[in-house]
Amino acid sequence: MKKRDTFYITILFILPILFVLCVSTYSMYGSKLDWLSQHISLADYFRQTQQLLPDSFENLQGQTNAFSFSYYGLLRPDVLVSYLFPNIPIHFFIIGYATLLWSSTGGLCYCWLRNKGYKDSIRFFSSICCICANCFFQSHQQIMFVEILPFLFLSLILIDS
């Protein structure tokens, strides 16, 4: 990897983090409707049970099976890591995980385009367009449908190699 590639990937990794930090100074990065009412409150309840895979949740929907809530991230990586740190609020993990995935998408897009043989300027501009896309604007509203993009670029890199 060239020195210029490392510089571009570093810029692509830092830009989303700076955006989240700028937004977070005045409010929380995330939607109060989707994040707070669903993902944060349910992930916090999952942690309060102190079980990795409980059979059921006694206080939710009349003792419903735990896998009924898999849509809300029962076994998401950020929720699993948050089990190790019960004193840290869950919204820090969810914001950090969303930011990490958003940041890594730009770098993975750049690497995929580099493997395809595009010029440096085209790779960098395309990766900037990727991290500024509308779906990442929505990442502060909904987290479930945007988290797949870095894994998409990673799979494209692996398929091409």
Where are these regions (language model features)?
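Start-transfer (signal-anchor) and selected internal transmembrane alpha helices
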Residues: 1-22
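Membrane-interface starts of transmembrane alpha-helices
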Residues: 4, 85-94, 119-126
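Membrane-interface coil-to-helix junctions
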Residues: 16-105, 130-149
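Transmembrane alpha-helix boundary and packing residues in multipass membrane permease domains
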Residues: 79, 107-111, 157
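Transmembrane helix-loop junction
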Residues: 83, 114-115, 161
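Transmembrane-helix signature of polytopic, membrane-embedded enzymes
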Residues: 110-132
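Extended basic-aromatic, gly/pro-enriched interface segments that bind polyanionic ligands
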Residues: 152
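Membrane-interface transmembrane helices that cradle and orient dolichyl/undecaprenyl
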Residues: 155-161
